[in-house]
Amino acid sequence: MANQIIDQAKVNMGKTEESLQRELGNIRAGRANASLLNQITVEYYGAPTPLNQMAAITIPEPRVLQVSPYDKSSLKNIETALNASDLGINPANDGDVIRLVIPQLTGERRKEIAKEVGKYSESAKIAIRNIRREGLDKLKRQEKDGDITEDDLHRLEKDMQKATDDATKRIDEIAAAKEKEITEV
């Protein structure tokens, strides 16, 4: 039972890391990345449909995203959805495909985005610490109820701390990689 608490904490920490990667994937870093369009939904035959299910998204050049709809009749709807999104990128429709040119980031904007990355990573670290605290509380309750010994509690606390340190290190690595991507010109 006590090891299950540690295992569940590790799973939850992994989910926090995945969530951070998703959040950071949505941040524009001055180069084309298909994940920028993951959140876009298009009104298609009266139903909201994710863009990546309606079109092939390719990167023909480092700063260009190309959206090639599977159904050419949906081109106008896709363009409308891209214009309505908060990407801040104007789509260019040539009748067959839509091209999105990612603008070059200014030095000031790069600093703002790097701060944003820092905020996301700090939120993830807080979530990791909360997971650790909840796990430790459960372990202490088990020790109090007599389910585990005091020695087991200390060993499990060390295991929980190691899992927390590992997760925090991975979050720092993820954030550092994104900051490096942002600051590269």
Curated annotation (Swiss-Prot):
Primary location class:
cytoplasm
Q: Which GO molecular-function terms appear in the entry?
A: ribosomal large subunit binding
Annotated Pfam families: RRF (PF01765)
Q: Where in the cell is it found?
A: Cytoplasm
Identify the InterPro entries for this entry: Ribosome_recyc_fac (IPR002661), Ribosome_recyc_fac_dom (IPR023584), RRF_sf (IPR036191)
Q: Which SUPFAM superfamilies match?
A: Ribosome recycling factor, RRF (SSF55194)
- GO cellular component terms listed in the entry, alphabetical order: cytoplasm
Task: Give the UniProt keywords, A-Z.
Answer: Cytoplasm, Protein biosynthesis
**Biological-process GO terms, alphabetical:** translational termination
Question: Mind telling me which Gene3D superfamilies this protein's record contains?
Answer: 3.30.1360.40, Ribosome-recycling factor
Described by its record, this protein's role is as follows: Responsible for the release of ribosomes from messenger RNA at the termination of protein biosynthesis. May increase the efficiency of translation by recycling ribosomes from one round of translation to another.
* Family (UniProt): Belongs to the RRF family.
The name under which this protein is listed is Ribosome-recycling factor
Whose protein is this, by species? Lacticaseibacillus paracasei (strain ATCC 334 / BCRC 17002 / CCUG 31169 / CIP 107868 / KCTC 3260 / NRRL B-441)
Q: State the organism's lineage.
A: Bacteria, Bacillati, Bacillota, Bacilli, Lactobacillales
